[in-house]
Amino acid sequence: MKLRPTLLSAAIIILGLPALAQTPRYADSNINFEKYFSPATEAEVAPDAQGFIGRWLLLDPISKPNRSNTVFVDSYIREAFQREYYKGMAASMNTLDKNFPKDGQKIKAVVDGQKPVDLTAGRPRFYEEPEIIPQKVTLKWHAIDSKFFNVKLFRFATGQDLTRYGVIFWAVTVINCEEDIENVRLAVGSNSASMWWLNNEEAVILSGDRRMVMDDCASERLTLKKGKNILKGAVINGPGMSDFCVRFIDEAGKPVTNITITTK
């Protein structure tokens, strides 16, 4: 008897046919960190040909339990990003002094811990509300170059076997300019919600449950000042694949490429 694929499952139950052997598959297993990132060097780098910024200092993901992204309205993410998980966290990313994050720097923090996400179905079980458990952790800063135009935060986490669902990622970098560059816009795409600041001034906010789309939101006109400019951002996600892409564009929508990028 030949069974149609659509009837196969029913036939197994009704006729008592042997179940087909299946190997569990997980989207985040056997991830090669080096496929997505390389260590940042001391030398300045330029953005890619399309202006995307690939060099960043990334902080290990901070546990922020959420089983749904529908809560990511402006007020929610503003409050989430204002929280300091260690003393002087915000100030350290605002000024290029001795407290500015450094590659390999380890920070002791207190986070909203959560039990490991149940992945027996190959993806998070959204209906399970996380139990929040205050937890002392050590977070580390990493100076990386992304091998793609978008920074794949999910792979950054899985490549280190760190929490990848219900998290906040912080990123900061330094934009170097030989002269003032006026009337540019910061164009961002992120999965899921995010906020971005240039020289400690809010530039753009992306709220809601969203997928990463190139140039999804753009800031008002900005000026990149001669010298060093600090660009930082925070991305929050519940379930799903976290990533972002960032570049500056001019008034014609063309990428700004006459800049260099460092982590200090």
Where in this protein do the model-derived segments appear?
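Bacterial N-terminal signal peptides that target proteins for export
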Residues: 1-8
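Non-cytosolic beta-sheet module surface loops
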Residues: 177, 186-190, 235-237
